[in-house]
């Protein structure tokens, strides 16, 4: 099975207008990603405010994205839920709609044991034959995969990757030492993208590439072409933007940045609220200094 979990993947924002999905803005955003040759997009993840979507909105968001992209790049759906039956429903619907694969985190809030985490993903794996990426974001979910659980899950044939949002630089090396075969590790933390690539990860799931897809793509291309200095220079240039996009809870800052660039309305759903005036000021200043235009 071809492993598409590699390269630059954008954790896409979900545009809203008047408390509804803004499908016109979605088309513009997706076409910008395709224009800059982003390797794949993640729809309805944390950055995409998945928890605020109704099931009907979730289906509409995926279906519209699949239609717009029209096989021009892979689409990954977010299927995280602390209700295993509902996570399975999301995965099955993703398959029906035509996405290429899906990502899921350990169930949040309920604090399952490692065995419970394994059984959750085993159930997902048995219910839907799409490729699966594990999503490690313990600051959000409250629980994480142990290395041993990752090893067990990697033996299920369609669990092919791990998105690691942490900063433990030893973790990719530990996992690569015990997990054999076609299993990819990607970083989901923009600030440590190069540090993690130096430890053997093969991809980057980025928030920043919503706003600066061209620069993010150039950074990875330079790294993959062994131009370490060139990659470092772009990374240093982007560092203030990485930090600005996490001044407040993601996706609050990136949604404002997208609005400032004319990509969508600055509309975010409760319990999240729009960026503070202080954050807006910093974001505008950094985008202007980088001469980012869409």
Curated annotation (Swiss-Prot):
Enzyme class: lyase
UniProt name for this protein: 4-hydroxy-tetrahydrodipicolinate synthase
Cysteine disulfide partners in this protein: none
Pfam families to which the protein is assigned, alphabetical: DHDPS
An MF annotation (GO) of this entry: (R,S)-4-hydroxy-2-oxoglutarate aldolase activity
Residues of the site described as Part of a proton relay during catalysis: 46, 109
The protein's role, per its UniProt record: Catalyzes the condensation of (S)-aspartate-beta-semialdehyde [(S)-ASA] and pyruvate to 4-hydroxy-tetrahydrodipicolinate (HTPA).
GO biological process: diaminopimelate biosynthetic process; glyoxylate catabolic process; lysine biosynthetic process via diaminopimelate
The reaction(s) this protein catalyses: L-aspartate 4-semialdehyde + pyruvate = (2S,4S)-4-hydroxy-2,3,4,5-tetrahydrodipicolinate + H2O + H(+)
Gene: dapA
């Amino acid at each position: 099975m071809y492993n598409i979990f590699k390269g630059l993947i954008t954790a896409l924002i979900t545009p809203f207008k008047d408390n509804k999905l803004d499908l016109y803005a979605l088309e513009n955003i997706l076409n910008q990603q395709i224009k800059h040759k982003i390797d794949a997009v993640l729809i309805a993840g944390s950055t995409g405010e998945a928890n605020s979507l109704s099931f009907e909105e979730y289906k509409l968001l995926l279906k519209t994205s699949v239609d717009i992209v029209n096989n021009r790049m892979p689409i990954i759906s977010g299927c995280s839920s602390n209700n295993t039956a509902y996570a399975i429903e999301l995965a099955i619907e993703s398959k029906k709609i035509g996405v290429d694969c899906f990502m899921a985190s350990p169930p949040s809030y309920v604090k399952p044991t490692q065995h419970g985490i394994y059984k959750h993903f085993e159930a997902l794996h048995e219910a839907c034959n799409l490729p699966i990426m594990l999503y490690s974001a313990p600051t959000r979910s409250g629980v994480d995969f142990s290395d041993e659980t990752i090893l067990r899950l990697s033996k299920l044939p369609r669990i092919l990757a791990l998105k690691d949002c942490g900063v433990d630089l030893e973790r990719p090396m530990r996992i690569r030492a015990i997990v054999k075969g076609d299993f990819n590790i990607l970083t989901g933390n923009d600030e440590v993208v190069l540090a993690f690539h130096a430890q053997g990860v093969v991809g980057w799931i980025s928030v920043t590439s919503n706003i600066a897809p061209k620069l993010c793509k150039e950074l990875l291309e330079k790294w993959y072409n062994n131009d370490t200095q060139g990659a470092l220079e772009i990374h240093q240039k982007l560092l203030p933007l990485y930090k600005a996009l996490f001044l407040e809870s993601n996706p609050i800052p990136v949604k404002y940045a997208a609005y400032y660039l004319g990509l969508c309305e600055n509309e975010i759903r409760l319990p999240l609220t729009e960026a503070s005036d202080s954050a807006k000021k910093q974001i505008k200043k950094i985008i202007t200094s980088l001469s980012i235009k869409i």
